[in-house]
Each structure stands twice: as structure tokens, then as C-alpha cells.
């Protein structure tokens, strides 16, 4: 299990992953997430410094964000977001009951396979009949870590009785070759959003999934 000390070491410098600079990705993410969180009570898992809380969840009625890093939570709280509150905790240890939507954006791939299974069991048990939103890279493994694959996510959803509502591409994977680089550049054109939805899996870096937990 990754520890608070591990993540505090990442957060020695603000925004270590450049999340606050990913405005194009965030716009794509908000197009997916927005209709599901407007006026809702949201539990945000792995909220980090609150960048996505501010850019994605501003239309939610309330947001409760948890992160394992005290440094990240201090910075998130300092944002002063009117609809959000933040707390330091391992999100595997908090209650999932009482929220309309649970969102795990760019965080679940930090869990080990066993921890991911434990998470989905807990989600299915404590969030029955409600909405779950997941986003992350679907490129498999690279030199840094093991991420998701589209097939792996769908298998996990099926195994834990989550019904897929929709999935949408968020951006292109430039390292997938010349064609992917061209595709990524094309996304900046006026009709780029239409092209984004047509990219094959091998050209996609991050994807967002919306599902409903079984009653």
C-alpha cells in the first residue's frame, strides 16, 4: 500500500503531475462528468490538491474530497472552494454511503491489484444504485507504472456488477507513434471533439467511464 509519506514526497513541489495545466483534458472531462454531478453530493477520492475539484465539480451541490497526503489536503483546503471540504485519509478506509456520486479521477491506478479489488467490493457494497465515475490512462504498462486497459476496466465493472452508462476518450496518446501524434494535433482543430470520440484504443491516453452500481 502506498503511504502518506510516499505522496508527501511527491508533493514537495506543488502540482507534481501538472494536473493544473491540463486544461484541454479537463474540458473534455467536464463534458462527460458535468451532467452527472450538477446539484449532487459528490465523494471525490484521491482529490490531491483540489485542481480537479475546482475545474470539474464546481456545479456539484457539495464535494467531500479525501487524499492520503496531508500536504495535498492543506493546499486543497487553501483554495477556499465554497462547495467543497477536504480531509486527510486513505480513501479505502472512509465510508462511501450517503453520496449521489463517487468519483475516482486519475487515482485508482496507484492501488495494487488486490487493493483495486477491495475498492470495487467496497464500492458495490456501500454505493448500491448510485453513480460511479472513473478516469485514467488506458495504455497498460509503461516505464513508470501499470495503468488500466479498457478491457481490464470493463472486466472489473462486470465482476462487481457495475452497469456501464458511457465511456468517452479524453485525449490522445502521443507516444503511440506518428499517427497518434497527428491525431493529437488534429484534436486542436474546430471539429477536434468529434475526432476525439473516434480514436481507436491504441491512440487513446485517458478515458472516462460512468457506471451505475447495482442495487
Model-derived features: positions:
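Class I (Rossmann-like) S-adenosyl-L-methionine-dependent methyltransferase catalytic domain
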Residues: 1-37, 43-95, 111-118, 122, ...
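Short, conserved loop/helix-junction motifs that constitute active-site signature segments
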Residues: 125-127
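Short catalytic micro-motifs in class I SAM-dependent methyltransferases
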Residues: 106-107
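A conserved beta-strand element that flanks and buttresses the S-adenosyl-L-methionine
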Residues: 103
Amino acid at each position: 500500500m502506498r503511504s502518506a509519506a510516499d505522496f508527501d514526497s511527491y508533493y514537495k513541489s506543488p502540482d507534481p503531475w501538472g494536473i493544473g495545466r491540463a486544461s484541454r483534458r479537463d474540458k473534455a472531462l467536464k463534458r462527460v462528468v458535468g451532467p452527472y454531478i450538477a446539484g449532487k453530493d459528490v465523494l471525490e477520492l484521491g482529490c490531491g490538491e483540489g485542481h480537479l475539484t475546482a475545474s470539474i465539480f464546481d456545479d456539484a451541490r457539495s464535494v467531500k474530497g479525501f487524499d492520503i497526503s496531508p500536504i495535498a489536503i492543506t493546499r486543497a483546503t487553501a483554495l477556499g472552494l465554497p462547495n467543497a471540504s477536504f480531509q486527510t485519509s486513505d480513501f479505502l478506509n472512509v465510508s462511501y454511503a450517503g453520496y449521489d456520486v463517487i468519483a475516482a479521477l486519475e487515482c485508482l491506478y496507484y492501488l495494487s491489484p488486490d487493493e483495486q479489488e477491495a475498492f470495487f467490493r467496497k464500492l458495490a457494497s456501500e454505493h448500491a444504485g448510485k453513480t460511479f465515475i472513473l478516469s485514467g490512462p488506458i495504455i497498460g504498462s509503461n516505464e513508470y507504472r501499470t495503468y488500466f486497459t479498457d478491457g481490464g476496466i470493463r472486466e472489473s465493472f462486470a465482476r462487481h456488477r457495475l452497469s456501464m452508462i458511457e465511456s468517452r476518450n479524453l485525449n490522445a496518446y502521443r507516444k503511440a507513434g506518428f499517427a497518434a501524434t497527428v491525431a493529437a494535433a488534429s484534436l486542436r482543430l474546430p471539429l477536434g471533439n468529434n475526432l476525439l470520440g473516434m480514436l481507436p484504443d491504441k491512440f487513446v491516453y485517458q478515458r472516462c467511464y460512468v457506471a451505475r452500481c447495482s442495487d
